[in-house]
A protein has these predicted regions:
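Small-side-chain structural scaffolding
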Residues: 7, 11, 31-34, 53, ...
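Specific register positions within alpha-helical solenoid repeats of the TPR/Sel1-like families, i.e.
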Residues: 35-38, 42, 81-84, 88, ...
């Protein structure tokens, strides 16, 4: 079976099953499907897949609740990061500060000084990536910033205190320091390699149901890698 046949088989499976996924997060839930189908639609230029991604995106935002966690894997930070990825990479159009205003406020409600979990999926590292990606998205000279100075200072202090626990390839400490110094890298766009390793080999199971549907060790991760290799554009 060719890579295209394998990809088509996975894509059909994702389209059928994503609307029924209860989790709305990026790494394990529907937002992973949103990101994938916007990316795939852009690759092949088919409006049908844009429409599908729009539908899935709306279902994610209408499912947000007051108790939706803020973590990256299953919560607001991952959803918000995916929105920035989609908009900054030209996969859809919109104003990120309008779309993400409520998410930013919920993220700032969490006292970062009390965070003991340093992990990417559920802890400080995922929050850092989201906040930094937001502040690097475009030059807001003369405009309100999504996060206030005191929050950024507290976040940097916590990150620096735990710098040995953070993934070096994301350069989170340096990027946040540059933001504090009013010199964020606006040219840096969110990349899929920020959240998954693209160097790992891809193994497609015969039974697609044997893997979770999402990005984290799942079928959507495989689909992203297969399409990315074909397009050489992740």
């Amino acid at each position: 079976m060719s890579h295209k046949e394998i990809s088509d088989r996975i894509i059909k499976y994702l389209m059928i099953n994503y609307p029924f996924v209860a989790d709305i997060g990026l790494m394990n839930g529907r937002m992973g499907g949103v990101l994938f189908f916007y990316y795939y639609a852009k690759c092949i230029g088919e409006d049908y897949f844009f429409d599908y991604a729009d539908m899935l995106f709306e279902s994610v935002f209408t499912s947000l609740r007051q108790d939706t966690p803020i973590d990256f894997a299953n919560g607001l930070c991952g959803i918000g990061w995916a929105v920035e990825y989609i908009l900054q990479n030209g996969l859809s159009e919109g104003e990120p500060d309008e779309v993400l205003e409520d998410i930013d406020k919920k993220v700032m409600e969490r006292d970062v000084r009390r965070i003991s979990d340093m992990s990417f999926d559920t802890g400080l590292e995922g929050i850092l990536l989201y906040v930094i990606t937001r502040l690097e998205s475009f030059d807001r000279a003369g405009l309100p910033k999504p996060f206030n100075r005191s929050y950024i200072e507290e976040l940097y202090a916590k990150a620096y205190e735990n710098k040995d626990s953070l993934s070096p390839h994301l350069q989170l400490i340096k990027r946040l320091a540059d933001i504090q110094a009013e010199r964020p890298d606006f040219a840096r766009k969110p990349n899929i390699s920020d959240i998954i390793s693209l160097s790992e080999s891809v193994t497609v199971p015969e039974n697609l149901r044997s893997l979770p549907i999402g990005i984290k060790n799942g079928l959507t991760e495989i689909a992203l890698k297969l399409i990315g290799k074909a397009q050489n554009s992740l």
